[in-house]
Curated annotation (Swiss-Prot):
It comes from the Viruses. InterPro entries: Bax_inhibitor_1-related (IPR006214). The chain crosses the membrane at residues 46-66, 77-97, 108-128, 133-153, 163-183, 186-206, 226-246. It is a multi-pass membrane protein. It is found in: Host membrane. Its main location: host cell. Pfam families: Bax1-I (PF01027). It comes from Human cytomegalovirus (strain Merlin). The keyword Transmembrane applies. One of its GO terms (cellular component) is host cell membrane. Belongs to the HHV-5 US12 protein family. This is Membrane protein US15.
Amino acid sequence: MRREKGFQVPTDGTVIYVPPGIQETRLATRSLAWVDCCRVALHTYGAVGWQLAGLTALLSAFCYAAPATWFHHSRLCLTESSPSLVFVIPVTSVIFIHCYETSHPSNIGVLLFYTLLHVPPLIVICLCLDGTLVISAALFTLLAFLSCTGVALLAPERTVRRQIVVIHALITLTFTAIVVVILRRGWSWCFKIVLSFSVLITCLAVSHFHEAALAVRYETPLERALLAAVKVFLSLVFTLLMVLRIMTLRTFLQTYFSSDKL
Protein backbone atom coordinates (compact mmCIF):
# COMPACT_ATOMS: atom_id res chain seq x y z
CA MET A 1 0.00 0.00 0.00
CA ARG A 2 1.39 3.41 -1.00
CA ARG A 3 0.28 6.90 0.04
CA GLU A 4 -0.43 9.79 -2.35
CA LYS A 5 -1.56 13.17 -0.90
CA GLY A 6 -4.13 11.91 1.56
CA PHE A 7 -5.00 8.81 -0.46
CA GLN A 8 -4.05 5.26 0.41
CA VAL A 9 -3.75 3.12 -2.72
CA PRO A 10 -3.69 -0.64 -2.02
CA THR A 11 -1.96 -2.97 -4.44
CA ASP A 12 -5.32 -4.04 -5.93
CA GLY A 13 -5.95 -0.50 -7.23
CA THR A 14 -8.71 0.48 -4.74
CA VAL A 15 -8.36 4.09 -3.58
CA ILE A 16 -9.22 4.95 0.05
CA TYR A 17 -9.32 8.58 1.12
CA VAL A 18 -7.94 9.36 4.59
CA PRO A 19 -8.37 13.00 5.71
CA PRO A 20 -5.15 14.68 6.86
CA GLY A 21 -6.71 15.45 10.26
CA ILE A 22 -7.11 11.76 11.05
CA GLN A 23 -3.50 11.12 10.12
CA GLU A 24 -2.35 13.93 12.43
CA THR A 25 -4.58 12.59 15.22
CA ARG A 26 -3.05 9.13 14.88
CA LEU A 27 0.45 10.61 15.03
CA ALA A 28 -0.42 12.71 18.08
CA THR A 29 -1.99 9.70 19.82
CA ARG A 30 1.12 7.61 19.27
CA SER A 31 3.32 10.44 20.54
CA LEU A 32 1.22 10.89 23.69
CA ALA A 33 1.23 7.14 24.31
CA TRP A 34 5.02 7.09 24.07
CA VAL A 35 5.27 10.08 26.43
CA ASP A 36 3.01 8.30 28.93
CA CYS A 37 5.19 5.19 28.70
CA CYS A 38 8.24 7.35 29.45
CA ARG A 39 6.46 8.88 32.46
CA VAL A 40 5.65 5.42 33.80
CA ALA A 41 9.22 4.27 33.20
CA LEU A 42 10.60 7.37 34.93
CA HIS A 43 8.38 6.88 37.98
CA THR A 44 9.07 3.14 38.14
CA TYR A 45 12.84 3.19 37.80
CA GLY A 46 13.04 6.34 39.88
CA ALA A 47 11.34 4.40 42.67
CA VAL A 48 13.77 1.52 42.11
CA GLY A 49 16.63 3.99 42.47
CA TRP A 50 15.23 5.27 45.76
CA GLN A 51 14.89 1.69 47.03
CA LEU A 52 18.47 0.91 46.07
CA ALA A 53 19.73 4.09 47.72
CA GLY A 54 17.75 3.40 50.89
CA LEU A 55 18.86 -0.22 51.10
CA THR A 56 22.49 0.73 50.46
CA ALA A 57 22.36 3.38 53.17
CA LEU A 58 20.75 0.93 55.61
CA LEU A 59 23.32 -1.80 54.98
CA SER A 60 26.22 0.67 55.10
CA ALA A 61 25.02 2.09 58.41
CA PHE A 62 24.57 -1.40 59.84
CA CYS A 63 28.02 -2.57 58.74
CA TYR A 64 29.57 0.62 60.14
CA ALA A 65 27.78 0.31 63.49
CA ALA A 66 28.14 -3.46 63.85
CA PRO A 67 30.74 -4.64 66.37
CA ALA A 68 33.97 -5.99 64.93
CA THR A 69 33.31 -9.39 66.51
CA TRP A 70 30.27 -9.85 64.24
CA PHE A 71 32.35 -9.93 61.08
CA HIS A 72 33.11 -13.50 59.96
CA HIS A 73 31.55 -14.83 63.18
CA SER A 74 31.25 -18.63 63.16
CA ARG A 75 27.57 -18.62 64.18
CA LEU A 76 26.50 -15.64 62.11
CA CYS A 77 28.40 -16.30 58.89
CA LEU A 78 26.50 -19.25 57.54
CA THR A 79 27.80 -18.42 54.07
CA GLU A 80 31.00 -20.35 54.75
CA SER A 81 29.59 -23.57 56.21
CA SER A 82 26.09 -23.57 54.69
CA PRO A 83 25.65 -20.67 52.27
CA SER A 84 22.45 -22.03 50.74
CA LEU A 85 20.53 -21.21 53.94
CA VAL A 86 20.95 -17.49 53.25
CA PHE A 87 19.43 -17.88 49.80
CA VAL A 88 16.31 -19.72 50.99
CA ILE A 89 14.65 -16.38 51.80
CA PRO A 90 14.73 -14.81 48.30
CA VAL A 91 13.81 -18.08 46.59
CA THR A 92 10.81 -18.71 48.84
CA SER A 93 9.70 -15.08 48.60
CA VAL A 94 9.69 -15.19 44.79
CA ILE A 95 7.70 -18.45 44.83
CA PHE A 96 5.22 -17.07 47.37
CA ILE A 97 4.71 -13.83 45.43
CA HIS A 98 4.04 -15.78 42.22
CA CYS A 99 1.52 -18.06 43.94
CA TYR A 100 -0.11 -15.15 45.78
CA GLU A 101 -0.63 -13.00 42.69
CA THR A 102 -2.10 -15.87 40.67
CA SER A 103 -4.95 -16.22 43.18
CA HIS A 104 -5.22 -12.70 44.68
CA PRO A 105 -5.11 -9.15 43.35
CA SER A 106 -1.74 -7.42 43.54
CA ASN A 107 -1.11 -5.93 46.97
CA ILE A 108 1.68 -3.42 47.46
CA GLY A 109 1.86 -4.22 51.18
CA VAL A 110 2.73 -7.86 50.53
CA LEU A 111 5.48 -6.90 48.09
CA LEU A 112 6.94 -4.32 50.48
CA PHE A 113 6.98 -6.91 53.26
CA TYR A 114 8.93 -9.35 51.13
CA THR A 115 11.22 -6.56 50.02
CA LEU A 116 12.17 -5.95 53.66
CA LEU A 117 12.57 -9.71 54.08
CA HIS A 118 15.58 -9.52 51.75
CA VAL A 119 17.47 -7.27 54.18
CA PRO A 120 18.64 -10.04 56.61
CA PRO A 121 20.43 -12.13 53.95
CA LEU A 122 22.01 -8.97 52.55
CA ILE A 123 23.25 -8.06 56.04
CA VAL A 124 24.75 -11.53 56.48
CA ILE A 125 26.42 -11.20 53.07
CA CYS A 126 27.92 -7.81 53.94
CA LEU A 127 29.27 -9.12 57.25
CA CYS A 128 30.57 -12.48 56.04
CA LEU A 129 31.72 -12.12 52.45
CA ASP A 130 34.65 -10.21 51.06
CA GLY A 131 33.72 -6.65 50.16
CA THR A 132 35.37 -6.91 46.74
CA LEU A 133 33.23 -9.95 45.95
CA VAL A 134 30.01 -8.16 46.92
CA ILE A 135 30.91 -5.01 44.97
CA SER A 136 31.83 -6.95 41.82
CA ALA A 137 28.57 -8.93 41.98
CA ALA A 138 26.57 -5.73 42.48
CA LEU A 139 28.27 -4.01 39.54
CA PHE A 140 27.65 -7.01 37.29
CA THR A 141 23.97 -7.10 38.28
CA LEU A 142 23.49 -3.37 37.76
CA LEU A 143 25.25 -3.52 34.39
CA ALA A 144 22.94 -6.30 33.20
CA PHE A 145 19.94 -4.43 34.62
CA LEU A 146 20.80 -1.14 32.93
CA SER A 147 21.66 -2.81 29.63
CA CYS A 148 18.42 -4.77 29.33
CA THR A 149 16.16 -1.98 30.56
CA GLY A 150 17.95 0.61 28.43
CA VAL A 151 17.35 -1.38 25.27
CA ALA A 152 13.70 -1.88 26.18
CA LEU A 153 13.04 1.77 27.02
CA LEU A 154 14.95 3.50 24.22
CA ALA A 155 14.21 1.25 21.25
CA PRO A 156 11.28 2.16 18.94
CA GLU A 157 7.93 0.47 19.47
CA ARG A 158 8.05 -1.33 16.13
CA THR A 159 11.12 -3.31 17.21
CA VAL A 160 9.60 -4.90 20.33
CA ARG A 161 9.63 -8.41 18.93
CA ARG A 162 13.10 -7.88 17.52
CA GLN A 163 14.26 -6.72 20.96
CA ILE A 164 13.01 -9.91 22.58
CA VAL A 165 14.69 -12.07 19.95
CA VAL A 166 18.01 -10.20 20.24
CA ILE A 167 18.06 -10.26 24.06
CA HIS A 168 17.17 -13.96 24.21
CA ALA A 169 19.80 -14.74 21.57
CA LEU A 170 22.48 -12.87 23.53
CA ILE A 171 21.48 -14.59 26.77
CA THR A 172 21.58 -17.99 25.03
CA LEU A 173 25.01 -17.33 23.53
CA THR A 174 26.34 -16.11 26.89
CA PHE A 175 24.99 -19.17 28.71
CA THR A 176 26.43 -21.50 26.05
CA ALA A 177 29.86 -19.87 26.26
CA ILE A 178 29.92 -20.09 30.06
CA VAL A 179 28.84 -23.75 30.01
CA VAL A 180 31.59 -24.58 27.49
CA VAL A 181 34.16 -22.94 29.77
CA ILE A 182 32.78 -24.84 32.78
CA LEU A 183 32.87 -28.20 30.99
CA ARG A 184 36.49 -27.69 29.90
CA ARG A 185 37.65 -27.19 33.49
CA GLY A 186 39.00 -30.09 35.52
CA TRP A 187 36.23 -30.00 38.11
CA SER A 188 33.99 -32.84 39.22
CA TRP A 189 30.77 -33.46 37.27
CA CYS A 190 28.67 -32.64 40.34
CA PHE A 191 30.22 -29.21 40.56
CA LYS A 192 29.85 -28.65 36.81
CA ILE A 193 26.14 -29.55 36.84
CA VAL A 194 25.28 -27.42 39.87
CA LEU A 195 27.28 -24.46 38.57
CA SER A 196 25.69 -24.70 35.10
CA PHE A 197 22.22 -24.79 36.65
CA SER A 198 22.98 -21.71 38.75
CA VAL A 199 24.27 -19.87 35.68
CA LEU A 200 21.07 -20.81 33.82
CA ILE A 201 18.89 -19.39 36.61
CA THR A 202 20.92 -16.18 36.63
CA CYS A 203 20.68 -15.79 32.84
CA LEU A 204 16.91 -16.24 33.03
CA ALA A 205 16.71 -13.60 35.76
CA VAL A 206 18.78 -11.18 33.66
CA SER A 207 16.53 -11.70 30.62
CA HIS A 208 13.57 -11.04 32.91
CA PHE A 209 14.84 -7.47 33.33
CA HIS A 210 14.18 -6.82 29.65
CA GLU A 211 10.67 -8.28 29.82
CA ALA A 212 9.92 -6.29 32.97
CA ALA A 213 11.07 -3.08 31.27
CA LEU A 214 8.85 -3.81 28.26
CA ALA A 215 5.90 -4.41 30.58
CA VAL A 216 6.58 -1.14 32.39
CA ARG A 217 6.83 0.82 29.16
CA TYR A 218 3.80 -0.57 27.32
CA GLU A 219 1.41 -2.01 29.91
CA THR A 220 1.83 -0.35 33.31
CA PRO A 221 -0.48 2.61 34.05
CA LEU A 222 0.95 5.48 36.04
CA GLU A 223 -1.06 4.68 39.18
CA ARG A 224 0.51 1.20 39.35
CA ALA A 225 4.09 2.43 38.92
CA LEU A 226 4.97 1.81 42.59
CA LEU A 227 3.79 -1.80 42.36
CA ALA A 228 5.88 -2.33 39.23
CA ALA A 229 8.88 -0.69 40.91
CA VAL A 230 8.76 -3.11 43.84
CA LYS A 231 8.56 -6.08 41.46
CA VAL A 232 11.54 -4.85 39.47
CA PHE A 233 13.47 -4.25 42.69
CA LEU A 234 12.74 -7.79 43.91
CA SER A 235 14.01 -9.27 40.67
CA LEU A 236 17.13 -7.08 40.93
CA VAL A 237 17.91 -8.23 44.48
CA PHE A 238 17.15 -11.85 43.59
CA THR A 239 19.61 -11.69 40.67
CA LEU A 240 22.28 -10.16 42.90
CA LEU A 241 21.88 -12.99 45.40
CA MET A 242 22.05 -15.56 42.60
CA VAL A 243 25.29 -14.03 41.30
CA LEU A 244 26.76 -14.19 44.80
CA ARG A 245 25.46 -17.75 45.08
CA ILE A 246 27.50 -18.70 42.01
CA MET A 247 30.60 -16.94 43.32
CA THR A 248 30.41 -18.79 46.66
CA LEU A 249 29.37 -22.13 45.17
CA ARG A 250 32.91 -23.51 45.14
CA THR A 251 33.26 -23.11 48.92
CA PHE A 252 29.80 -24.59 49.45
CA LEU A 253 30.57 -27.76 47.48
CA GLN A 254 34.01 -28.11 49.01
CA THR A 255 32.39 -28.08 52.44
CA TYR A 256 29.73 -30.69 51.66
CA PHE A 257 31.61 -32.99 49.31
CA SER A 258 35.11 -32.52 50.77
CA SER A 259 36.68 -32.83 47.34
CA ASP A 260 40.01 -31.34 46.36
CA LYS A 261 39.26 -31.67 42.65
CA LEU A 262 36.94 -28.68 42.41
